[in-house]
């Protein structure tokens, strides 16, 4: 019987900086952080900016909406959408060790009626029929251990992202990296959404 090739995933570790705990993927790059005494606070400015979609919706409707995070990180967005906004929330994460770390060290709740984590490839998962046209807030933060560029950054991927959204749905993407090209990423998003639909925060 043929053996399936095993995907090599980076080890997960963390560090402490005063009241803040950081998640790392086998490198110095911070993949997410948590204020230990206030685990749902959004510590980093870029994470706060990924909540910019709230500017475009009626606050009274937020709890009735659905959020989907591609990339769990330290679970900041997942915890915030679930606990603070009371939204139905799902995260898709490739690395089971990241999920284990989030549950053990970053106070991510167990799966429940309003929150779940799916272990899998985000690019494949979002193409499943269950995600078509149902997501109100899609939050994309997909980096490897080197944090050099988004690991999923193609026009086809962004077209699949758009297909998950409701009519009022919004996608926020963390664009950061030592070798990533901001404009090239924007052009790929524009191919799916149209340049007029893109905003920088």
Task: List each model region and its residues.
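N-terminal auxiliary segments of SAM/dcSAM-dependent transferases
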Residues: 1-30
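The AdoMet/dcAdoMet-binding core of the Class I SAM-like
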Residues: 5, 38-167, 180
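A short, flexible beta-alpha/helix-coil linker loop
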Residues: 28-32, 143-146, 171
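Glycine-centered flexibility motif
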Residues: 32, 120-122, 194
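Short acidic, glycine/proline-rich loop/turn micro-motifs
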Residues: 33-37
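C-terminal substrate-binding/active-site "lid" region of AdoMet-derived donor-dependent transferases
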Residues: 155-201
């Amino acid at each position: 019987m043929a053996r399936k090739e095993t995907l090599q995933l980076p080890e997960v570790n963390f560090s402490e900086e005063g009241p803040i705990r950081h998640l790392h993927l086998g490198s110095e790059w911070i993949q997410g952080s948590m204020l230990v005494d206030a685990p749902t606070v959004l510590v980093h400015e870029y994470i706060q900016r990924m909540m910019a979609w709230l500017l475009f919706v009626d606050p009274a409707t937020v709890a009735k909406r659905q959020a989907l995070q591609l990339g769990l990180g330290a679970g900041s967005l997942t915890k915030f959408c679930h606990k603070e906004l009371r939204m139905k929330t799902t995260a898709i994460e490739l690395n089971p060790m990241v999920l284990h770390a989030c549950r053990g060290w970053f106070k991510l709740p167990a799966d429940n009626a309003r929150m779940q984590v799916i272990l899998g490839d985000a690019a494949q998962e979002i193409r499943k029929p269950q995600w078509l046209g149902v997501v109100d807030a899609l939050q994309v933060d997909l980096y490897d251990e080197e944090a050099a560029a988004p690991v999923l950054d193609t026009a086809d991927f962004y077209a699949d992202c758009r297909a998950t959204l409701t009519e009022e749905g919004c996608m926020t993407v963390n664009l950061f990296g030592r070798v990533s090209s901001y404009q090239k990423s924007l052009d790929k998003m524009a191919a799916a959404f149209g340049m007029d639909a893109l905003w920088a925060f």
